[in-house]
């Protein structure tokens, strides 16, 4: 992946930054692509860094993700709740599966999407191999995770758990306006809110 660099001029000279480092100075974190352990570790580190820099200022988490590993997503979710600053979530492009879950986990009143974003929720995916006993253990674990995800989505959207469970049985796609009505986001952004 090509990462652009920007040059900042000051009275002390010029300094170049990769674009993500420059955005981090403005408290912006980009969650882009499939969510896995390596990406989650980077997001968690940035959240913790920004909290240490200033625990009173909001953090802006831009999401463009098809989803990914549940435990990786949970590490981001738990950190969002652990730190003091509010985390504003903004969907750009798509927020599907774990991406949509994290979008819904932004601070209340601070969950946004750009107009042409695509949002999708569904039940967790899993693949089990091995002996019958191992498959049974994996099935129980994925059902446990499904319950946790549904409970958190119900809390975030103010929907009943039964509705979340029904809607996530299959891929459930929403426009940004539908996601707002559903309670996954608070507002569709036409212009920057900063």
UniProtKB/Swiss-Prot annotation:
Alphabetical UniProt keywords: Cytoplasm, Hydrolase, Protease, Serine protease
Single GO term (MF): serine-type endopeptidase activity
Subcellular location: Cytoplasm
Coiled coil: none
Catalytic residues identified in the record: 97, 122
Keyword Protease carried by entry: yes
CDD domains on file: S14_ClpP_2
Pfam families the UniProt entry points to: CLP_protease (PF00574)
Family membership: Belongs to the peptidase S14 family.
Function: Cleaves peptides in various proteins in a process that requires ATP hydrolysis. Has a chymotrypsin-like activity. Plays a major role in the degradation of misfolded proteins.
Protein's name in the database: ATP-dependent Clp protease proteolytic subunit
């Amino acid at each position: 992946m090509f990462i652009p660099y920007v040059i900042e001029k000051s009275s002390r000279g010029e300094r170049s930054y990769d674009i993500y480092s420059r955005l981090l100075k403005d408290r912006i974190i980009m969650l882009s692509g499939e969510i896995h352990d390596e990406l989650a570790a980077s997001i968690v580190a940035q959240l913790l860094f920004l909290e240490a820099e200033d625990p009173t200022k909001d953090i802006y988490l831009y999401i463009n993700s098809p989803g990914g590993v549940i435990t990786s997503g949970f590490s981001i979710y738990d950190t969002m709740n652990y730190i003091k600053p509010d985390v504003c979530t903004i969907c750009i492009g798509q927020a599907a599966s774990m991406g949509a879950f994290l979008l819904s986990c932004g601070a209340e009143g601070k969950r946004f999407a750009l107009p042409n974003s695509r949002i999708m929720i569904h039940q967790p995916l899993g693949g089990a191999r091995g002996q019958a006993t191992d498959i049974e253990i994996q099935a129980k674990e994925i059902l446990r995770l499904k319950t946790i995800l549904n409970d958190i989505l119900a809390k975030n959207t103010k929907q009943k758990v039964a509705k979340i469970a029904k809607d996530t049985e299959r891929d459930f796609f929403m426009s940004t306006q539908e996601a707002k009505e559903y309670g996954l986001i608070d507002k569709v952004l036409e212009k920057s809110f900063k």
